Amino acid sequence: MVRPGLAAALASGSVTSARVISVNVGRGRDADWAGKLGRTAIDKRPVAGRVEVGRLGLGGDEQVDKPAHGGPEQAVYAYAREDLDWWVEQLGRDLANGLFGENITTAGVDVTGALIGETWQVGTATVQVTGPRIPCVVFAGWMDERQWVRQFADARRPGAYLRVLREGMVAAGDPVEVVSRPDERVTIAESMTAYYGDAELMSRLLRVEGRGLAWDEIAPAVLQRAAAGS
């Protein structure tokens, strides 16, 4: 069965190459399930035409909880249509492009296997992979799935946050090209494992050039817990 999110890409024959199939933006709104802030912009919807990719995110997009899901280190969030389709099978429900709050939905891109610190050319912008999406109570409230935080974390299909190295424009149909990869190889999936307590992976991650700066703040607690438990 052809998934709804892939229909347009299949029609154009574009799923065989790495590309953007949807650009998604959203504005903040109040919600009683939106954690302590009571407000969220997780509801991202596909937009037509070319969209500006700036240092702090996409034109027309809002980030409500910037410390957790915004700023220059997390300016853009990318998620693979293939991973969304995996979740379709797990959850038994349709998942539209943008439903996970991603700004860019890709096809033909191994986002889960992307390396921390690798750079992509997306449209006319250059971006760098900085880290995984860590699920939170707002995401759980939005999805309305039991035990969603744990389920999403355990799946190790978190999508990738991106730092914008060169501003530009992006639209559905634009190719995604890997420009460079760091010598130290830690994938998005492995970085999530590091976040949840793997000291060996965390030590490797700290050697990655271009990693998100937040790792330097997260690492001490992970390494200390590992040392205390050894």
Model-flagged regions — what are they?
Residues 157-158, 176:
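A structural signal for small-residue-enriched, beta-sheet-centric alpha/beta enzyme cores
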Residues 1-141, 147, 180-230:
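Electropositive, beta-rich accessory/interaction domains or terminal extensions
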Residues 172-181:
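Basic (Lys/Arg-enriched) interaction patch that binds polyanionic ligands
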